[in-house]
Amino acid sequence: NYKDALSASGNKGVTRHYPFVPGIDAAGVISDGNSLQFTEGDEVIVTGYDMGMNTPGGFGEYINVPVEWVVKKPDNLTNLEAMSIGTAGLTAAASVLKILESSNESDLPVLVSGATGGVGSIGVMLMSKLGKEVSALTGKSSSVEFLKSIGAANVIMRDNYLEAPSKAIERPLFSCAIDTVGGNVLSKMLPQISPHGVVACCGNVAGIEVNTTVFPFILRGISLCGIDSAESPIDFKNSIWQKFADEWKLDLSPMIKIVTKENLQQEIDLILKGGQQGRV
C-alpha cells in the first residue's frame, strides 16, 4: 500500500515514532486474546484504523490490535486472496458502492484513474464484473495490455488526457469515475461527468488541490464523494469482505506479485515512484 511505503520511508505524517513495523493490512490466525468474539485458531482479517501507522502492523509476524478492528475471514477467501484485496480492495469496493447508489443511468464508460495501482486495478475489475464499460487512465504505456486483461475496454494515456484543452463544463464523456490520484486529473474529469454522475475520490498522489468551478455541480448535479475505507465501521468492512467472497469474487492472479520481506525495500521505492502495477 502507498501508506505502507510512506511509513517505511520515515514519513512523520503517517508514523510519529521509529523504529516501527508498517503494514496497514494483515490476515492470519488468532493465537491469543481476551475477547469472547474470537477464539484461538480463528482466521481473521485486520485492515486500516491505526494499524501500520502508529500501531505496529502487518509486516510483523505477530500483531496485537483491539478486537474492534478485527473481521472474521470468510471461508471462501484464502489469506492470500484477502491480502491481495486488502485496504486497496476495500477502498475500490466502497467507491463502487457509492457509484451504484447514484441515480445516473448513462451508458457512457466509467473512468478509473491511476488504473494500474491497487485501488485502480481492483476498481477496473469490479466495474467490469458488474457489466460496466471501463475507461482506464494511466501514465504507463507498458501497462495497456495488462489493463485490458483485467477488464478495461479503453485505455487512455494520462499525458494525452491532460494536454487536451479544458473548459468549465464539457461534453459528457463518462458516466461516473473512481479517482485514485487527485490533483489535476480530478480537476480535469469533473466537467466531463454526465448528469447525476458520481466521482469517488480516494487518493492524492497527483496533488491535494482541485481546480474546478461550480458548473458541474449546479448544471449537471454531479457528486464528488470522498472515500476513506481505513476508518469505515467494522460492520461495513465485514459486508464488503462477504461480497468479495461471494458475488464480487475476483480472479486476482493476473495482478498480484509475491515478494519476500527481504525484497520489500525495492517495492517500497517502486510505489513511491509511481511504478507499481497491481498488488504486492
Question: Predicted regions: what is each one?
Answer:
Residues N1, S9-M51:
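Glycine-rich beta-strand-centered segment in the early N-terminal region that forms part
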Residues D42-E43, Y62, K129, V198:
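Residue-level marker of beta-strand positions
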Residues I45, S175-I178, A200:
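N-terminal Rossmann-like NAD(P) cofactor-binding module of classical short-chain dehydrogenase/reductase
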Residues V46-L111:
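NAD(P)H dinucleotide-binding glycine-rich loop of Rossmann-like/cofactor-binding domains
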Residues M83-R158:
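Mid-domain Rossmann-like dinucleotide-binding core that forms the NAD(H)/NADP(H) cofactor-binding site
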Residues Y161-P172:
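Short amphipathic alpha-helix with an adjacent loop that forms part of the alpha/beta core around
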Residues N184-D251:
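Glycine-rich phosphate-binding loop and adjacent beta-alpha segment
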Residues D235-V280:
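C-terminal hydrophobic helical "lid"/dimerization subdomain
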